[in-house]
């Protein structure tokens, strides 16, 4: 209590009834009101860099009631088997997501083999979509020590571009589509970010995939 304030805490509410209860009971206990949001709003915010909008849960429920085939598809995506398939997909992704190449920038040079070994053996515990950044930080630090100065922001951005190009894709929407296609599910439309509207049944699977590939 002495270390945390209301500004440091967010309560994830399963529904509006719970949210209303919390907002009423805390002041009665002499506590400050704590920021709260629904699970769905939290998920939507976490995916806002990937899709422009997400379907509301009520709309999905309405569609399920009217379309049994759609309801069955939703149930599959809520199953343990679906989660296990996502886990399996990510395990295999390491071998085909990367496209290593020799790195050359001024006096900074690393061979394809050196970068491959660093990626798989020096930083194996770092999530896949953050691992190349760790490799880059290591290589840049080594180079800065060698030349006796820090690279400027413009130089760092050029180097980062060279490293990030070694990913075949870092777009979570694209990677989730790879998964859907590989496991025989209906894929999402291949459209630009501005037109991406994520169905509710895909929100939490995509969020789970994000947390498998990134720390947050």
State where each predicted segment sits.
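Alpha-helical nucleic-acid-binding subdomain
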Residues: 2-216
């Amino acid at each position: 209590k002495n270390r945390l304030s209301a500004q440091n805490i967010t309560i994830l509410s399963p529904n509006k009834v719970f949210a209303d209860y919390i907002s009423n009971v805390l002041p009665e206990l002499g506590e400050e009101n704590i920021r709260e949001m629904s699970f769905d709003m939290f998920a939507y915010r976490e995916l806002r860099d990937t899709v422009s909008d997400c379907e509301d849960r009520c709309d999905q429920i309405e569609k399920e009631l009217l379309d049994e085939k759609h309801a069955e598809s939703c149930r599959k995506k809520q199953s343990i088997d679906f989660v296990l398939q996502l886990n399996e997909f990510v395990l295999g992704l390491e071998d085909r997501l990367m496209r290593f190449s020799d790195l050359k920038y001024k006096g900074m040079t690393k061979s394809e083999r050196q970068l491959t070994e660093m990626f798989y053996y020096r930083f194996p515990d770092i999530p896949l979509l953050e691992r190349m950044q760790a490799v880059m930080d290591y290589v840049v630090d080594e180079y800065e020590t060698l030349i006796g100065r820090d690279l400027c922001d413009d130089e760092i951005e050029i180097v980062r571009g060279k490293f990030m190009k070694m990913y075949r894709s870092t777009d979570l929407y694209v990677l989730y589509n790879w998964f859907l296609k590989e496991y025989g599910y209906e894929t999402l439309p291949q459209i630009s970010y501005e037109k991406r509207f994520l169905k509710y049944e895909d929100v939490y699977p995509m969020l789970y995939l994000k947390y498998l590939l990134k720390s947050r």
